[in-house]
Amino acid sequence: MNHFLDIHKTAPEDLRQIIDQAGQMKTARLGRPKGTPDDEQPLAGHMVALIFEKPSTRTRVSFDVGVRQMGGETMVLSGKDMQLGHGETIADTARVLSRYVDMIMIRTFDETVLTEMAEYADVPVINGLTDRTHPCQIMADILTYEEHRGPIKGKKVVWTGDGNNVCASFLHAAGQFGFDLTFTGPAQLDPEDEFIGFARNAGSKITIERDAAKAVEGADLVVADTWVSMHDSQSSKERRHNMLRPYQVNDALMAHAKPDALFMHCLPAHREEEVTSAVMDGPQSVIFDEAENRLHAQKAVMRWCLGV
């Protein structure tokens, strides 16, 4: 039994196994209707709990479809259903759920909820997102880059904007997969030293560059994410927009990257804010392949967790 809590907590050889299997499983499904089962049914007889303290379209649909394609069943629970940490402890909830299901995926605001769930659960726990990291997204991103351009090892990735949870997992991946990462954004939004330190200690070149055009020079991959959250106040949104406007990904910025550089965004995107429609819909964008690959990467993660 394996938990998938964070990229830096998973061995590089296991991460590589997951990526390779995801690619194989994707190829095996080419041309099939989405609702048809996989030839292999490794999750037959398995029940998977999908817990959403923080709602999501892509995470819910991709995990639900993935489980069903592999022969399993899902139970979707919202924060209202669970009341995690209010009344019954997270530890007791983990123990009880372990009697009903074979695996737990949780998308939560608080990383401590994830770690405590994993500590006390008797079944694998998968990090569907926390406010600190988003490892499943990055596995999809690695899969996407490699199916378009080959091995990501030694490549230059540029993260633009806010050093958020997705950026943190990209830094973990830099260390585990052996690529370099440049962060370009305002100093107030730098990624935490912990994430930068992990990647540097693993041998990756991590650079902080305030000038977006300089940062993107020679990039193999440029990545953006939303500047604001639905929970931000109007004044906070305006402040962040003013701070981040110099880091918008547009055609002029992409011109500084390599001619064959790719653009990624985990979606949903705010068009004409962090990225222009011209880039999103342009030939360098692989955002919809990236969205699809959440499905294939997570299927491989689930198989690895269960050892099937």
From Swiss-Prot:
PROSITE patterns linked: CARBAMOYLTRANSFERASE
Family: Belongs to the aspartate/ornithine carbamoyltransferase superfamily. OTCase family.
This protein's pathway: Amino-acid biosynthesis; L-arginine biosynthesis; L-arginine from L-ornithine and carbamoyl phosphate: step 1/3
GO cellular component term, pick one: cytoplasm
Gene name of the encoded protein: argF
Source species of the chain: Ruegeria sp. (strain TM1040) (Silicibacter sp.)
Protein name as it appears in the record: Ornithine carbamoyltransferase
Single GO biological process annotation from the record: citrulline biosynthetic process
Positions bound to L-ornithine: 165, 225, 229-230
Its biological purpose: Reversibly catalyzes the transfer of the carbamoyl group from carbamoyl phosphate (CP) to the N(epsilon) atom of ornithine (ORN) to produce L-citrulline.
Main location: cytoplasm
